[in-house]
Amino acid sequence: MDGIKYAVFTDKSIRLLGKNQYTSNVESGSTRTEIKHWVELFFGVKVIAMNSHRLPGKGRRMGPIMGHTMHYRRMIITLQPGYSIPPLRKKRT
């Protein structure tokens, strides 16, 4: 199960990078232990703490029909000092 969807780059997440904390959206059904194991295995880092919160989906209207987007979970992963996750490169066009 590939738990991490994508990295999040907001004002708060960029500020947390200075504290060696990385923010990403993950699948809503994944657990903390699964994400921790996956991050440690894939990136070769040591995770010391994980914070998560569930963000609600937003309402979307299309004519008379009211729908909604899916909810998702956001994880803030704190690494041990000396470890870092390499920056994600954006594809240039």
Curated annotation (Swiss-Prot):
- Entry-linked Gene3D superfamilies: 3.30.70.330
Location in the cell: Plastid, Chloroplast
Where would you find the membrane-spanning parts of this chain?
none
Q: Which residues form a coiled coil?
A: none
What PROSITE patterns is this protein classified in?
RIBOSOMAL_L23
- Location (main, coarse): plastid
Biological process (GO) annotations held by this record are: translation
Query: In which domain of life is the source organism classified?
Result: Eukaryota
Q: State one molecular function term (GO).
A: mRNA binding
Entry keyword set: Chloroplast, Plastid, Ribonucleoprotein, Ribosomal protein, RNA-binding, rRNA-binding
Q: Which GO terms describe its cellular component?
A: chloroplast; ribonucleoprotein complex; ribosome
Checking InterPro entries in the record gives: Nucleotide-bd_a/b_plait_sf, Ribosomal_uL23-like, Ribosomal_uL23/eL15/eS24_sf, Ribosomal_uL23_CS
Q: What does this protein do?
A: Binds to 23S rRNA.
Cross-referenced HAMAP family = Ribosomal_uL23_B
The entry's family comment says: Belongs to the universal ribosomal protein uL23 family.
How it assembles, according to the record, is: Part of the 50S ribosomal subunit.
> Which PANTHER family does UniProt cross-reference here?
60S RIBOSOMAL PROTEIN L23A
Protein name per UniProt: Large ribosomal subunit protein uL23cz/uL23cy
The scientific name of the source species is: Cucumis sativus
